[in-house]
Amino acid sequence: MQKLIQGLGVGAGAALGVCVRLALTLWLGDSAWPILTINVLGAFLMGWLRPNAFWGTGFLGGFTTFSAMMLNDVSFYFFTAVGCILAWLAGDRLAR
């Protein structure tokens, strides 16, 4: 029963962390810099405060979003490469 209660606490902390991250992202803008700032702040707080499961795994785990940052990076590089290739092909076509 204690593991269930701890799991629910971690879930509640994660939900709270996600809400705070969303509010900050809406306020600061949805780009790489706010996400990077949130992740660095979350990692700093995790190391400095050494929080329990609710605040650490839950809140700070939901607050940080390393996977979303990686997805943004991969998407940026993929679409940049595809966009550059398509732009080059279009320019090459026009030159003929």
From Swiss-Prot:
It comes from the Bacteria. It is found in: Cell membrane. The keyword Membrane applies. Keywords: Cell membrane, Ion channel, Ion transport, Membrane, Metal-binding, Sodium, Transmembrane, Transmembrane helix, Transport. GO terms for cellular component: plasma membrane. It is a multi-pass membrane protein. One of its GO terms (biological process) is cellular detoxification of fluoride. InterPro entries: FluC. Disulfide bonds: none annotated. Na(+) is not transported, but it plays an essential structural role and its presence is essential for fluoride channel function. GO terms for molecular function: fluoride channel activity; metal ion binding. The chain crosses the membrane at residues 4-24, 26-46, 69-89. The keyword Transmembrane applies. Coiled coil: none annotated. Na(+) binds at G61, T64. It catalyses: fluoride(in) = fluoride(out). HAMAP family: FluC. Belongs to the fluoride channel Fluc/FEX (TC 1.A.43) family. Fluoride-specific ion channel. Important for reducing fluoride concentration in the cell, thus reducing its toxicity. NCBIfam families: PRK00134.1. This is Fluoride-specific ion channel FluC 1. It comes from Corynebacterium glutamicum (strain ATCC 13032 / DSM 20300 / JCM 1318 / BCRC 11384 / CCUG 27702 / LMG 3730 / NBRC 12168 / NCIMB 10025 / NRRL B-2784 / 534). The lineage of its organism: Bacteria, Bacillati, Actinomycetota, Actinomycetes, Mycobacteriales.
